[in-house]
Design a protein with these regions (language model features):
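Phosphate/NTP-binding elements of NTP-utilizing enzymes
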Residues: 1-180
């Protein structure tokens, strides 16, 4: 499964194999299952440099994007870490994306993080070692150099952040033109 998840740049295999999400119908967390249009969105992310999702509210795209970012961070190397910038019209909304991503990162099986973070010995310190170098409301930084940053929209939203590899503009309809 790992090799298939790694090879699948849409991250569908990774998401459906290793992640779970809240199912409102069942009222509990269940294994992530992508609907056909969600699969099409993930395939578009894999095949295109820039993707804009124009969709109604409550379609699960923010959660799906968070799951995809998780896959990108899991498979990133220290030589080419991901820098993800999440911008929303309010800081709290951008921080909600970080909460989703953190939840997904914590679901990733420990062995996927490598020998420094996993041991078959259940009493090993490796199994509880944090994958986060920074774990704050506004930013996550993983041991492999990946960063996820939350910012409110505004003229300085991306100031001080270089080499953004993934930009998420959440609820873009509420972001004023020219301030993201």
């Amino acid at each position: 499964d790992y090799a298939l998840a790694y090879a699948d740049k849409s991250r569908i295999k990774f998401i459906e194999t290793y992640l779970s999400t809240f199912n409102a119908t069942k009222g509990k967390k269940t294994q992530f299952h992508c609907f056909p249009r969600q699969r099409a969105f993930l395939k578009a992310l894999a095949e295109n440099r820039n993707v804009v999702a124009i969709k109604p509210r409550q379609c699960g795209i923010t959660t799906l994007s968070s799951a995809w970012v998780t896959g990108q961070c899991v498979f990133a190397s220290k030589d080419a870490p991901e820098t993800v910038l999440c911008i929303a019209n309010k800081l709290e909304q951008a921080q909600e994306i970080i909460i989703k991503i953190r939840d997904f990162l914590e679901q990733v099986p420990r062995w996927m993080w490598g020998n420094d973070y996993f041991s078959p010995d259940p009493n090993s310190e490796k199994n509880i070692k944090s994958i986060f170098e920074k774990d704050a409301k506004g930013e996550l930084k993983l041991f492999n150099g990946c960063r996820v940053i939350a910012r409110a929209s505004g003229p300085n939203a991306s100031r001080g952040i270089s080499a953004v590899s993934v930009l998420i503009l959440d609820e873009a309809a509420f972001i004023e033109e020219g301030v993201a």
